[in-house]
Amino acid sequence: MSLFLTACDDGSDGSTGAAGVDGTDGIAGVDGINTNNGHLQQIGRYASGIFDDGGAEIVAFDKSTNKLFVVNSGANTIDVLDISEPSQPTKLTTLNVADQDAVSFTSGGANSVAVNNGLLAVAVEADNQQDTGRIYVYNTSDNGFVTAFTAGALPDMVAFSADGQYLLSANEGQPSNDYSNDPEGSITVVDLSAGVASAAVSQATFTAFNTQQTALTDAGVRITGPGATVAMDLEPEYISFAIDNDTAYITLQENNALALVDLASATVTGIVALGYKDHSLQGAGLDGNKNDDYPVILNQPIFGMYMPDSIASYEFNGKTYLITANEGDGREYIYDTDSTTCTNAGHTDLGGGECLSHSDEVALEDLALDPGVFTADQISELQDGSGWGDLTVTNTNGDADGNDQFEGIYAFGARSFSIWNEEGEQVFDSGDQIEQIVADQSPLFFNLSNDKNSPDNRSDNKGPEPEGVAIGTVGNRTYAFIGLERQSGIMVFDVTNPFSPAFVEYNSNRDLSVDPGEGVDAGDLGPEGMIFISAEDSPNGKALLIVGNEVSGTTTLYQVQ
Protein backbone atom coordinates (compact mmCIF):
# COMPACT_ATOMS: atom_id res chain seq x y z
CA MET A 1 0.00 0.00 0.00
CA SER A 2 1.27 3.44 -0.87
CA LEU A 3 0.00 6.84 0.16
CA PHE A 4 0.16 9.76 -2.24
CA LEU A 5 0.15 13.11 -0.46
CA THR A 6 -0.03 15.95 -2.94
CA ALA A 7 0.10 19.30 -1.21
CA CYS A 8 -1.28 22.31 -3.02
CA ASP A 9 2.01 24.09 -3.65
CA ASP A 10 3.98 21.01 -4.67
CA GLY A 11 1.24 19.89 -7.02
CA SER A 12 1.07 23.25 -8.73
CA ASP A 13 4.79 23.34 -9.41
CA GLY A 14 4.71 19.89 -10.96
CA SER A 15 1.75 20.67 -13.17
CA THR A 16 3.33 23.79 -14.59
CA GLY A 17 6.45 21.94 -15.60
CA ALA A 18 4.52 19.22 -17.37
CA ALA A 19 2.46 21.70 -19.31
CA GLY A 20 5.60 23.41 -20.54
CA VAL A 21 6.91 20.23 -22.11
CA ASP A 22 3.84 19.10 -23.99
CA GLY A 23 2.09 22.39 -24.59
CA THR A 24 3.87 23.12 -27.88
CA ASP A 25 2.28 20.17 -29.65
CA GLY A 26 -1.10 21.19 -28.32
CA ILE A 27 -0.94 24.66 -29.84
CA ALA A 28 -0.43 23.29 -33.32
CA GLY A 29 -3.31 20.89 -32.85
CA VAL A 30 -5.72 23.53 -31.63
CA ASP A 31 -5.05 25.66 -34.69
CA GLY A 32 -6.70 22.97 -36.77
CA ILE A 33 -9.97 22.77 -34.80
CA ASN A 34 -13.14 22.66 -36.86
CA THR A 35 -15.73 23.88 -34.38
CA ASN A 36 -18.48 22.20 -36.40
CA ASN A 37 -17.09 18.89 -35.16
CA GLY A 38 -18.15 19.83 -31.65
CA HIS A 39 -21.54 21.30 -32.54
CA LEU A 40 -24.45 19.84 -30.56
CA GLN A 41 -27.74 19.49 -32.40
CA GLN A 42 -30.73 18.23 -30.46
CA ILE A 43 -32.39 15.44 -32.43
CA GLY A 44 -34.53 13.66 -29.82
CA ARG A 45 -36.05 14.09 -26.38
CA TYR A 46 -38.03 11.94 -24.00
CA ALA A 47 -40.01 13.38 -21.08
CA SER A 48 -40.64 11.12 -18.09
CA GLY A 49 -43.50 13.28 -16.85
CA ILE A 50 -41.81 13.69 -13.47
CA PHE A 51 -40.67 17.23 -12.73
CA ASP A 52 -38.21 18.29 -10.03
CA ASP A 53 -37.97 14.80 -8.58
CA GLY A 54 -35.14 13.05 -10.40
CA GLY A 55 -37.19 11.83 -13.36
CA ALA A 56 -34.05 11.35 -15.50
CA GLU A 57 -30.65 11.10 -13.86
CA ILE A 58 -27.98 8.58 -14.92
CA VAL A 59 -28.09 7.06 -18.41
CA ALA A 60 -26.49 3.98 -20.01
CA PHE A 61 -26.63 2.64 -23.59
CA ASP A 62 -26.58 -0.92 -24.91
CA LYS A 63 -25.38 -0.98 -28.52
CA SER A 64 -26.57 -4.55 -29.17
CA THR A 65 -30.22 -3.66 -28.55
CA ASN A 66 -30.21 0.13 -29.03
CA LYS A 67 -31.74 0.42 -25.58
CA LEU A 68 -31.16 3.35 -23.29
CA PHE A 69 -31.49 2.76 -19.55
CA VAL A 70 -32.38 5.83 -17.49
CA VAL A 71 -32.49 6.11 -13.71
CA ASN A 72 -35.88 7.56 -12.75
CA SER A 73 -35.46 8.13 -9.03
CA GLY A 74 -38.79 9.93 -8.82
CA ALA A 75 -40.54 6.66 -9.63
CA ASN A 76 -37.79 4.42 -8.16
CA THR A 77 -37.45 2.66 -11.51
CA ILE A 78 -35.21 2.29 -14.52
CA ASP A 79 -36.89 3.57 -17.68
CA VAL A 80 -35.98 1.47 -20.71
CA LEU A 81 -36.06 3.50 -23.94
CA ASP A 82 -35.70 2.36 -27.53
CA ILE A 83 -33.46 4.77 -29.44
CA SER A 84 -33.18 2.78 -32.67
CA GLU A 85 -34.42 6.01 -34.19
CA PRO A 86 -32.66 8.64 -32.07
CA SER A 87 -35.04 11.38 -33.14
CA GLN A 88 -37.94 9.42 -31.64
CA PRO A 89 -36.93 7.83 -28.33
CA THR A 90 -39.72 5.54 -27.17
CA LYS A 91 -40.32 4.02 -23.77
CA LEU A 92 -40.40 0.22 -23.89
CA THR A 93 -40.84 -0.68 -20.23
CA THR A 94 -39.64 0.02 -16.72
CA LEU A 95 -37.55 -2.03 -14.33
CA ASN A 96 -38.63 -1.75 -10.72
CA VAL A 97 -35.70 -2.64 -8.48
CA ALA A 98 -38.12 -3.31 -5.62
CA ASP A 99 -39.26 -6.42 -7.50
CA GLN A 100 -35.98 -8.03 -6.46
CA ASP A 101 -36.31 -7.27 -2.75
CA ALA A 102 -35.61 -10.28 -0.56
CA VAL A 103 -36.08 -11.18 3.08
CA SER A 104 -32.58 -9.92 3.84
CA PHE A 105 -32.74 -6.73 1.78
CA THR A 106 -35.24 -3.95 1.15
CA SER A 107 -34.26 -1.50 -1.57
CA GLY A 108 -34.45 2.24 -1.18
CA GLY A 109 -34.08 3.10 -4.86
CA ALA A 110 -31.70 3.02 -7.81
CA ASN A 111 -28.84 5.51 -8.05
CA SER A 112 -26.82 4.57 -11.13
CA VAL A 113 -26.70 2.31 -14.18
CA ALA A 114 -23.96 0.96 -16.44
CA VAL A 115 -23.90 -1.40 -19.43
CA ASN A 116 -21.27 -3.75 -20.83
CA ASN A 117 -21.44 -6.82 -23.06
CA GLY A 118 -25.16 -7.42 -22.71
CA LEU A 119 -25.29 -6.80 -18.97
CA LEU A 120 -27.01 -3.94 -17.15
CA ALA A 121 -25.73 -3.12 -13.67
CA VAL A 122 -27.79 -1.03 -11.27
CA ALA A 123 -26.54 0.53 -8.03
CA VAL A 124 -29.28 0.06 -5.44
CA GLU A 125 -29.26 1.64 -2.00
CA ALA A 126 -30.90 0.01 1.00
CA ASP A 127 -34.11 1.41 2.45
CA ASN A 128 -31.93 2.38 5.40
CA GLN A 129 -29.12 4.20 3.60
CA GLN A 130 -26.57 3.23 6.22
CA ASP A 131 -27.09 -0.49 5.53
CA THR A 132 -25.22 -2.31 2.78
CA GLY A 133 -26.61 -1.84 -0.71
CA ARG A 134 -26.63 -4.08 -3.75
CA ILE A 135 -25.54 -4.18 -7.37
CA TYR A 136 -28.36 -5.70 -9.40
CA VAL A 137 -27.49 -7.26 -12.76
CA TYR A 138 -29.93 -7.72 -15.64
CA ASN A 139 -29.71 -8.97 -19.22
CA THR A 140 -30.12 -6.13 -21.70
CA SER A 141 -31.69 -8.43 -24.30
CA ASP A 142 -34.84 -9.31 -22.36
CA ASN A 143 -34.42 -7.09 -19.26
CA GLY A 144 -34.40 -10.25 -17.16
CA PHE A 145 -32.88 -10.24 -13.69
CA VAL A 146 -29.62 -12.20 -13.43
CA THR A 147 -28.15 -11.79 -9.96
CA ALA A 148 -27.31 -9.42 -7.12
CA PHE A 149 -23.94 -8.60 -5.56
CA THR A 150 -23.57 -7.17 -2.06
CA ALA A 151 -22.08 -3.67 -2.08
CA GLY A 152 -21.22 -1.20 0.68
CA ALA A 153 -23.42 1.46 2.24
CA LEU A 154 -25.12 3.75 -0.28
CA PRO A 155 -23.72 2.59 -3.65
CA ASP A 156 -23.98 5.87 -5.53
CA MET A 157 -22.30 5.01 -8.82
CA VAL A 158 -21.68 1.81 -10.76
CA ALA A 159 -19.28 1.29 -13.69
CA PHE A 160 -17.73 -1.44 -15.83
CA SER A 161 -14.10 -1.37 -16.91
CA ALA A 162 -13.80 -0.98 -20.68
CA ASP A 163 -12.75 -4.63 -21.11
CA GLY A 164 -15.72 -5.82 -19.06
CA GLN A 165 -13.60 -7.72 -16.55
CA TYR A 166 -14.47 -5.55 -13.58
CA LEU A 167 -17.70 -4.09 -12.24
CA LEU A 168 -17.37 -1.46 -9.51
CA SER A 169 -19.63 0.53 -7.24
CA ALA A 170 -18.63 3.64 -5.31
CA ASN A 171 -20.23 3.25 -1.89
CA GLU A 172 -20.60 6.71 -0.39
CA GLY A 173 -21.32 5.65 3.18
CA GLN A 174 -23.11 8.85 4.19
CA PRO A 175 -24.04 9.25 7.85
CA SER A 176 -27.58 9.28 9.15
CA ASN A 177 -29.10 12.73 9.47
CA ASP A 178 -28.65 12.69 13.24
CA TYR A 179 -25.04 11.54 12.75
CA SER A 180 -25.59 8.56 15.06
CA ASN A 181 -24.52 6.11 12.34
CA ASP A 182 -21.66 6.91 9.97
CA PRO A 183 -20.79 3.82 7.90
CA GLU A 184 -17.44 3.50 6.17
CA GLY A 185 -17.09 4.49 2.53
CA SER A 186 -15.83 1.74 0.25
CA ILE A 187 -15.52 0.48 -3.32
CA THR A 188 -17.06 -2.83 -4.34
CA VAL A 189 -14.93 -4.68 -6.91
CA VAL A 190 -16.61 -7.51 -8.82
CA ASP A 191 -14.24 -9.63 -10.93
CA LEU A 192 -16.25 -11.01 -13.86
CA SER A 193 -13.37 -12.77 -15.62
CA ALA A 194 -14.88 -16.19 -14.83
CA GLY A 195 -18.39 -15.07 -15.76
CA VAL A 196 -21.28 -13.61 -13.80
CA ALA A 197 -22.20 -16.90 -12.14
CA SER A 198 -18.65 -17.33 -10.82
CA ALA A 199 -17.91 -13.68 -10.08
CA ALA A 200 -15.59 -12.82 -7.20
CA VAL A 201 -16.80 -9.93 -5.03
CA SER A 202 -14.40 -7.88 -2.89
CA GLN A 203 -14.78 -4.73 -0.82
CA ALA A 204 -11.91 -2.24 -1.14
CA THR A 205 -11.91 -0.29 2.12
CA PHE A 206 -10.02 2.64 3.61
CA THR A 207 -9.41 1.14 7.05
CA ALA A 208 -5.67 0.85 6.39
CA PHE A 209 -5.55 4.66 6.26
CA ASN A 210 -7.13 5.19 9.68
CA THR A 211 -3.69 5.49 11.28
CA GLN A 212 -2.62 8.10 8.72
CA GLN A 213 -5.24 10.75 9.41
CA THR A 214 -2.75 13.44 10.40
CA ALA A 215 -0.64 12.91 7.28
CA LEU A 216 -3.74 12.99 5.09
CA THR A 217 -5.16 16.17 6.60
CA ASP A 218 -1.74 17.85 6.49
CA ALA A 219 -1.64 17.06 2.76
CA GLY A 220 -5.07 18.61 2.23
CA VAL A 221 -7.49 15.67 2.42
CA ARG A 222 -10.58 16.90 4.29
CA ILE A 223 -11.48 14.66 7.24
CA THR A 224 -14.12 16.76 8.98
CA GLY A 225 -16.92 14.56 10.30
CA PRO A 226 -17.44 14.68 14.08
CA GLY A 227 -15.62 11.74 15.64
CA ALA A 228 -15.09 10.08 12.26
CA THR A 229 -12.21 7.82 11.32
CA VAL A 230 -10.65 8.23 7.88
CA ALA A 231 -12.64 5.27 6.56
CA MET A 232 -15.89 6.67 7.94
CA ASP A 233 -15.30 10.18 6.60
CA LEU A 234 -14.23 9.33 3.04
CA GLU A 235 -17.20 9.30 0.65
CA PRO A 236 -16.52 7.67 -2.76
CA GLU A 237 -18.57 9.43 -5.41
CA TYR A 238 -17.67 8.62 -9.02
CA ILE A 239 -15.54 6.08 -10.91
CA SER A 240 -13.26 6.09 -13.94
CA PHE A 241 -10.59 3.69 -15.18
CA ALA A 242 -7.02 3.81 -16.42
CA ILE A 243 -6.61 2.98 -20.10
CA ASP A 244 -5.02 -0.38 -19.19
CA ASN A 245 -8.04 -1.29 -17.01
CA ASP A 246 -5.73 -2.11 -14.09
CA THR A 247 -6.51 0.92 -11.93
CA ALA A 248 -9.71 2.73 -10.97
CA TYR A 249 -9.83 6.40 -10.01
CA ILE A 250 -12.53 7.35 -7.52
CA THR A 251 -13.52 10.91 -6.65
CA LEU A 252 -13.91 11.60 -2.93
CA GLN A 253 -15.93 14.76 -3.38
CA GLU A 254 -16.52 15.99 0.16
CA ASN A 255 -12.90 15.15 0.99
CA ASN A 256 -11.42 17.09 -1.98
CA ALA A 257 -9.41 14.03 -2.92
CA LEU A 258 -8.96 11.15 -5.35
CA ALA A 259 -8.59 7.46 -4.46
CA LEU A 260 -6.60 4.97 -6.55
CA VAL A 261 -7.72 1.34 -6.53
CA ASP A 262 -5.69 -1.61 -7.82
CA LEU A 263 -8.33 -3.82 -9.42
CA ALA A 264 -6.48 -7.13 -9.39
CA SER A 265 -6.06 -7.00 -5.61
CA ALA A 266 -9.17 -4.89 -4.90
CA THR A 267 -7.04 -2.60 -2.75
CA VAL A 268 -7.00 1.15 -2.27
CA THR A 269 -3.38 1.96 -3.06
CA GLY A 270 -3.36 5.73 -2.65
CA ILE A 271 -5.28 8.84 -1.68
CA VAL A 272 -4.36 12.06 -3.49
CA ALA A 273 -5.27 15.47 -2.10
CA LEU A 274 -6.39 17.69 -4.99
CA GLY A 275 -5.29 21.00 -3.51
CA TYR A 276 -6.96 24.39 -3.83
CA LYS A 277 -7.66 26.94 -6.52
CA ASP A 278 -6.36 30.45 -5.86
CA HIS A 279 -9.12 32.85 -6.94
CA SER A 280 -6.79 35.82 -6.43
CA LEU A 281 -4.84 34.87 -9.56
CA GLN A 282 -5.50 36.35 -12.99
CA GLY A 283 -7.82 34.11 -14.98
CA ALA A 284 -9.13 32.35 -11.88
CA GLY A 285 -11.69 34.85 -10.59
CA LEU A 286 -15.25 34.22 -9.53
CA ASP A 287 -18.53 36.01 -9.01
CA GLY A 288 -19.46 35.45 -5.38
CA ASN A 289 -22.04 38.24 -5.14
CA LYS A 290 -25.64 37.38 -6.00
CA ASN A 291 -27.08 40.72 -4.95
CA ASP A 292 -26.06 42.81 -7.96
CA ASP A 293 -28.07 40.60 -10.38
CA TYR A 294 -25.32 40.80 -12.99
CA PRO A 295 -22.04 39.02 -13.72
CA VAL A 296 -19.07 40.69 -12.06
CA ILE A 297 -16.15 38.25 -12.01
CA LEU A 298 -13.39 39.40 -9.68
CA ASN A 299 -10.15 38.16 -8.22
CA GLN A 300 -10.47 37.79 -4.47
CA PRO A 301 -8.32 36.31 -1.66
CA ILE A 302 -10.41 33.14 -1.67
CA PHE A 303 -9.48 29.52 -2.32
CA GLY A 304 -11.76 27.09 -4.11
CA MET A 305 -11.87 23.45 -3.03
CA TYR A 306 -12.08 21.45 -6.27
CA MET A 307 -14.34 18.74 -4.79
CA PRO A 308 -15.13 17.05 -8.12
CA ASP A 309 -18.30 15.08 -8.69
CA SER A 310 -17.93 13.31 -12.05
CA ILE A 311 -14.68 11.99 -13.47
CA ALA A 312 -13.84 10.55 -16.90
CA SER A 313 -10.62 9.30 -18.46
CA TYR A 314 -8.98 9.20 -21.87
CA GLU A 315 -5.65 8.44 -23.51
CA PHE A 316 -2.99 10.85 -24.74
CA ASN A 317 0.46 9.71 -25.85
CA GLY A 318 -0.08 6.32 -24.25
CA LYS A 319 -1.00 7.67 -20.82
CA THR A 320 -4.22 8.09 -18.88
CA TYR A 321 -5.58 11.57 -18.24
CA LEU A 322 -8.53 12.33 -16.01
CA ILE A 323 -11.12 15.07 -16.41
CA THR A 324 -13.10 16.21 -13.39
CA ALA A 325 -16.14 18.47 -13.10
CA ASN A 326 -15.38 20.55 -10.00
CA GLU A 327 -18.84 21.00 -8.53
CA GLY A 328 -18.17 21.21 -4.80
CA ASP A 329 -20.34 19.84 -2.02
CA GLY A 330 -20.83 20.81 1.59
CA ARG A 331 -22.12 18.75 4.48
CA GLU A 332 -25.30 19.66 6.32
CA TYR A 333 -27.36 17.10 8.21
CA ILE A 334 -30.79 17.97 9.59
CA TYR A 335 -33.29 15.66 11.24
CA ASP A 336 -36.71 15.93 12.83
CA THR A 337 -37.01 15.85 16.60
CA ASP A 338 -38.16 17.97 19.53
CA SER A 339 -35.99 20.76 20.88
CA THR A 340 -35.15 18.97 24.14
CA THR A 341 -33.85 15.86 22.38
CA CYS A 342 -31.93 18.05 19.96
CA THR A 343 -30.14 20.13 22.58
CA ASN A 344 -29.45 17.09 24.78
CA ALA A 345 -27.65 15.54 21.82
CA GLY A 346 -25.43 18.61 21.58
CA HIS A 347 -27.01 19.64 18.30
CA THR A 348 -28.51 22.94 17.13
CA ASP A 349 -32.25 23.45 17.45
CA LEU A 350 -33.48 25.15 14.27
CA GLY A 351 -37.07 25.40 15.46
CA GLY A 352 -40.15 23.92 13.88
CA GLY A 353 -39.08 20.42 14.88
CA GLU A 354 -35.81 20.55 12.92
CA CYS A 355 -32.41 19.84 14.44
CA LEU A 356 -28.97 20.42 12.87
CA SER A 357 -26.52 17.67 13.78
CA HIS A 358 -23.57 18.85 11.68
CA SER A 359 -22.65 21.45 9.07
CA ASP A 360 -19.37 22.55 7.53
CA GLU A 361 -20.98 25.52 5.76
CA VAL A 362 -21.09 29.15 6.86
CA ALA A 363 -21.70 32.52 5.22
CA LEU A 364 -18.50 34.46 4.59
CA GLU A 365 -19.84 37.39 6.61
CA ASP A 366 -19.99 35.12 9.68
CA LEU A 367 -16.36 34.02 9.40
CA ALA A 368 -13.95 35.83 11.74
CA LEU A 369 -11.12 36.88 9.42
CA ASP A 370 -7.61 37.30 10.81
CA PRO A 371 -6.72 41.05 10.67
CA GLY A 372 -3.07 40.08 10.52
CA VAL A 373 -3.66 38.40 7.15
CA PHE A 374 -6.51 40.38 5.59
CA THR A 375 -6.40 44.15 5.29
CA ALA A 376 -9.19 46.29 6.64
CA ASP A 377 -10.25 47.09 3.08
CA GLN A 378 -10.40 43.40 2.18
CA ILE A 379 -12.47 42.56 5.24
CA SER A 380 -14.82 45.43 4.48
CA GLU A 381 -15.23 44.42 0.83
CA LEU A 382 -15.84 40.77 1.63
CA GLN A 383 -18.06 41.13 4.68
CA ASP A 384 -19.57 44.56 5.19
CA GLY A 385 -22.69 44.69 3.04
CA SER A 386 -20.95 44.28 -0.31
CA GLY A 387 -22.88 41.14 -1.23
CA TRP A 388 -19.85 38.89 -0.96
CA GLY A 389 -20.78 38.21 2.65
CA ASP A 390 -23.44 35.74 1.48
CA LEU A 391 -20.86 33.50 -0.22
CA THR A 392 -21.03 29.99 1.23
CA VAL A 393 -17.63 28.95 2.58
CA THR A 394 -16.43 26.29 4.98
CA ASN A 395 -15.71 26.61 8.67
CA THR A 396 -13.39 23.58 8.68
CA ASN A 397 -10.49 24.99 6.62
CA GLY A 398 -8.46 28.15 7.09
CA ASP A 399 -7.85 28.38 10.83
CA ALA A 400 -4.50 26.61 10.98
CA ASP A 401 -3.47 27.97 14.38
CA GLY A 402 -6.84 27.26 15.99
CA ASN A 403 -7.37 30.77 17.38
CA ASP A 404 -10.86 31.10 15.82
CA GLN A 405 -9.57 33.70 13.35
CA PHE A 406 -9.38 32.48 9.78
CA GLU A 407 -6.20 33.08 7.80
CA GLY A 408 -7.77 31.59 4.67
CA ILE A 409 -11.19 31.55 3.01
CA TYR A 410 -12.23 28.30 1.33
CA ALA A 411 -15.30 28.10 -0.93
CA PHE A 412 -16.99 24.94 -2.20
CA GLY A 413 -16.09 23.85 -5.73
CA ALA A 414 -13.87 25.52 -8.30
CA ARG A 415 -16.46 26.49 -10.97
CA SER A 416 -14.27 24.73 -13.53
CA PHE A 417 -13.15 21.47 -15.02
CA SER A 418 -9.64 20.15 -14.51
CA ILE A 419 -7.36 17.64 -16.18
CA TRP A 420 -5.06 15.45 -14.07
CA ASN A 421 -2.36 12.95 -14.94
CA GLU A 422 -2.11 9.35 -13.71
CA GLU A 423 -0.49 10.47 -10.46
CA GLY A 424 -3.27 12.93 -9.68
CA GLU A 425 -1.24 16.01 -10.58
CA GLN A 426 -3.18 18.81 -12.22
CA VAL A 427 -2.04 19.63 -15.76
CA PHE A 428 -4.90 22.00 -16.67
CA ASP A 429 -7.73 23.94 -15.07
CA SER A 430 -10.27 26.02 -16.96
CA GLY A 431 -9.94 28.87 -14.47
CA ASP A 432 -12.88 31.25 -14.61
CA GLN A 433 -13.59 30.41 -18.25
CA ILE A 434 -16.98 28.80 -17.60
CA GLU A 435 -18.35 31.84 -15.77
CA GLN A 436 -16.74 34.20 -18.31
CA ILE A 437 -18.35 32.36 -21.23
CA VAL A 438 -21.82 32.36 -19.68
CA ALA A 439 -21.40 36.03 -18.73
CA ASP A 440 -20.45 36.86 -22.31
CA GLN A 441 -23.12 34.82 -24.06
CA SER A 442 -26.00 35.13 -21.58
CA PRO A 443 -25.34 38.00 -19.13
CA LEU A 444 -28.99 38.44 -18.17
CA PHE A 445 -29.26 34.76 -17.27
CA PHE A 446 -25.98 34.27 -15.46
CA ASN A 447 -25.51 31.79 -12.60
CA LEU A 448 -29.15 30.79 -12.57
CA SER A 449 -30.58 28.09 -10.39
CA ASN A 450 -32.12 25.15 -12.22
CA ASP A 451 -35.50 25.82 -10.61
CA LYS A 452 -35.82 29.59 -11.11
CA ASN A 453 -34.83 32.19 -13.70
CA SER A 454 -33.44 34.77 -11.27
CA PRO A 455 -30.06 36.07 -12.53
CA ASP A 456 -27.03 35.72 -10.25
CA ASN A 457 -29.05 33.49 -7.95
CA ARG A 458 -26.25 30.93 -7.50
CA SER A 459 -23.24 33.23 -7.48
CA ASP A 460 -22.99 32.95 -3.71
CA ASN A 461 -23.05 29.15 -3.79
CA LYS A 462 -20.87 27.29 -6.31
CA GLY A 463 -21.95 29.34 -9.33
CA PRO A 464 -22.80 27.29 -12.44
CA GLU A 465 -21.92 24.00 -10.66
CA PRO A 466 -20.10 21.92 -13.28
CA GLU A 467 -21.22 18.42 -12.33
CA GLY A 468 -21.26 16.00 -15.27
CA VAL A 469 -18.52 15.10 -17.73
CA ALA A 470 -18.38 12.89 -20.80
CA ILE A 471 -15.52 12.43 -23.24
CA GLY A 472 -15.77 11.43 -26.89
CA THR A 473 -13.80 11.43 -30.11
CA VAL A 474 -15.15 12.75 -33.41
CA GLY A 475 -12.78 12.41 -36.32
CA ASN A 476 -9.32 13.06 -34.93
CA ARG A 477 -10.45 15.38 -32.14
CA THR A 478 -11.34 14.51 -28.55
CA TYR A 479 -14.03 16.54 -26.81
CA ALA A 480 -15.06 17.00 -23.20
CA PHE A 481 -18.71 17.77 -22.56
CA ILE A 482 -19.20 19.51 -19.21
CA GLY A 483 -22.71 19.61 -17.75
CA LEU A 484 -23.58 22.69 -15.69
CA GLU A 485 -26.15 21.46 -13.18
CA ARG A 486 -27.57 24.77 -11.98
CA GLN A 487 -27.07 26.82 -15.13
CA SER A 488 -28.58 23.94 -17.12
CA GLY A 489 -26.15 24.09 -20.02
CA ILE A 490 -23.37 22.09 -21.63
CA MET A 491 -19.86 23.35 -22.33
CA VAL A 492 -17.85 21.71 -25.10
CA PHE A 493 -14.05 21.82 -25.06
CA ASP A 494 -11.49 20.30 -27.39
CA VAL A 495 -9.21 18.33 -25.06
CA THR A 496 -7.26 16.41 -27.70
CA ASN A 497 -4.11 17.64 -26.00
CA PRO A 498 -4.76 17.66 -22.24
CA PHE A 499 -2.22 20.44 -21.72
CA SER A 500 -3.96 22.94 -24.00
CA PRO A 501 -7.75 22.51 -24.22
CA ALA A 502 -9.76 24.96 -26.33
CA PHE A 503 -13.35 26.12 -25.90
CA VAL A 504 -15.68 25.03 -28.70
CA GLU A 505 -19.23 26.01 -27.75
CA TYR A 506 -21.78 26.58 -25.03
CA ASN A 507 -25.17 24.95 -25.49
CA SER A 508 -28.32 25.33 -23.44
CA ASN A 509 -31.65 23.66 -24.16
CA ARG A 510 -33.37 25.72 -21.48
CA ASP A 511 -36.25 28.00 -22.42
CA LEU A 512 -35.59 31.12 -20.38
CA SER A 513 -38.93 32.64 -21.36
CA VAL A 514 -40.72 29.94 -19.35
CA ASP A 515 -40.73 29.76 -15.57
CA PRO A 516 -39.19 26.44 -14.45
CA GLY A 517 -42.22 25.88 -12.25
CA GLU A 518 -44.29 25.35 -15.40
CA GLY A 519 -42.63 21.99 -15.94
CA VAL A 520 -41.39 20.37 -19.11
CA ASP A 521 -42.06 23.46 -21.27
CA ALA A 522 -39.14 25.16 -19.52
CA GLY A 523 -36.76 22.92 -21.44
CA ASP A 524 -33.94 20.82 -20.05
CA LEU A 525 -33.07 21.60 -16.44
CA GLY A 526 -30.38 20.09 -14.23
CA PRO A 527 -28.13 17.97 -16.47
CA GLU A 528 -26.94 15.06 -14.33
CA GLY A 529 -25.76 11.98 -16.22
CA MET A 530 -24.04 12.25 -19.61
CA ILE A 531 -22.75 9.61 -22.01
CA PHE A 532 -21.06 9.83 -25.40
CA ILE A 533 -21.88 7.25 -28.07
CA SER A 534 -19.36 6.92 -30.88
CA ALA A 535 -20.49 6.95 -34.49
CA GLU A 536 -19.43 3.29 -34.71
CA ASP A 537 -21.82 2.29 -31.92
CA SER A 538 -24.59 4.80 -32.66
CA PRO A 539 -27.99 3.68 -34.02
CA ASN A 540 -27.85 6.31 -36.79
CA GLY A 541 -24.13 6.12 -37.51
CA LYS A 542 -23.52 9.57 -36.02
CA ALA A 543 -21.81 10.43 -32.76
CA LEU A 544 -24.34 11.17 -30.02
CA LEU A 545 -24.34 12.82 -26.62
CA ILE A 546 -27.15 11.72 -24.32
CA VAL A 547 -28.04 13.73 -21.23
CA GLY A 548 -30.31 12.91 -18.31
CA ASN A 549 -31.81 16.09 -16.83
CA GLU A 550 -32.89 15.47 -13.24
CA VAL A 551 -35.04 18.57 -12.65
CA SER A 552 -37.00 18.58 -15.92
CA GLY A 553 -37.10 14.77 -15.95
CA THR A 554 -36.10 14.74 -19.61
CA THR A 555 -33.59 12.65 -21.53
CA THR A 556 -32.11 14.56 -24.46
CA LEU A 557 -30.27 13.17 -27.46
CA TYR A 558 -27.78 15.40 -29.26
CA GLN A 559 -25.98 14.65 -32.49
CA VAL A 560 -22.34 15.71 -32.34
CA GLN A 561 -21.29 17.06 -35.70
Language model feature labels by segment:
Residues C8-T35:
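Collagen/collagen-like triple-helix recognition
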